């Protein structure tokens, strides 16, 4: 019986250790995600005019996947040194027109 209790205690300790490791990994992943997000915000703040930044944040509320794609593309271009001046609201509108999928126009013809 003592052997079974020891075995149970070892299992319990091992399970607790695994749980601690998993929690630590989750905390590290969350911290890494926060750092990446902070870097993205800093880069976008540096390359976007306030009006363009506001438009992008509104777009993020309505269409997060499109906003994320545009943000990633802008960050990539900035890191590659391909953006020479701040992006204005007008420039961002043009970028968004190119990125958004074309809508099919449905025409109804009545006879």
UniProtKB/Swiss-Prot annotation:
InterPro entries: DNA_bind_arc, PDCD5-like, PDCD5-like_sf
Keywords linked to the UniProt accession: DNA-binding
Keyword Chloroplast among record annotations: no
TM annotation in the entry: none
Gene Ontology CC terms, in alphabetical order: cytosol
Example of a GO MF term: DNA binding
Source species, domain of life: Archaea
Gene3D superfamilies: PDCD5-like
Disulfide bonding pattern of the chain: none
Family stated for the protein in its record: Belongs to the PDCD5 family.
NCBIfam families xrefs: PRK04239.1
Protein name per UniProt: DNA-binding protein AF_2068
Organism: Archaeoglobus fulgidus (strain ATCC 49558 / DSM 4304 / JCM 9628 / NBRC 100126 / VC-16)
């Amino acid at each position: 019986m003592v052997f079974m209790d020891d075995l149970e205690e070892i299992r319990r300790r091992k399970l607790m250790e695994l749980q601690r490791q998993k929690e630590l990994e989750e905390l590290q992943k969350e911290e890494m995600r926060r750092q990446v997000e902070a870097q993205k915000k800093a880069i976008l703040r540096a390359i976007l005019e306030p009006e363009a930044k506001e438009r992008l944040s509104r777009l993020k509320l309505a269409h997060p996947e499109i906003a994320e794609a545009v943000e990633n593309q802008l960050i990539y271009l900035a890191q590659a040194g391909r953006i020479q001046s701040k992006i204005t609201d007008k420039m961002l509108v043009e970028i968004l027109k190119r990125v958004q999928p074309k809508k099919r126009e449905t025409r109804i013809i009545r006879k």
